[in-house]
């Protein structure tokens, strides 16, 4: 989880990713941020986030992003 938060902080400094639960809904992360995030997550965790995974529910909080990464690592 800590690595996910570090990546998020690199992309969008100044956001409290430990408590924020509406990163997409409140437009804290925009589409460019998501593309950057996906690339960094794919590289850092050696996973492949597919277009099917690119739904707001998977990216609304650091916890949801971590759950996505964990699920993809197990596949």
Language-model features: where?
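Internal alpha/beta domain cores that form substrate/cofactor-binding pockets in large enzymes
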Residues: 38
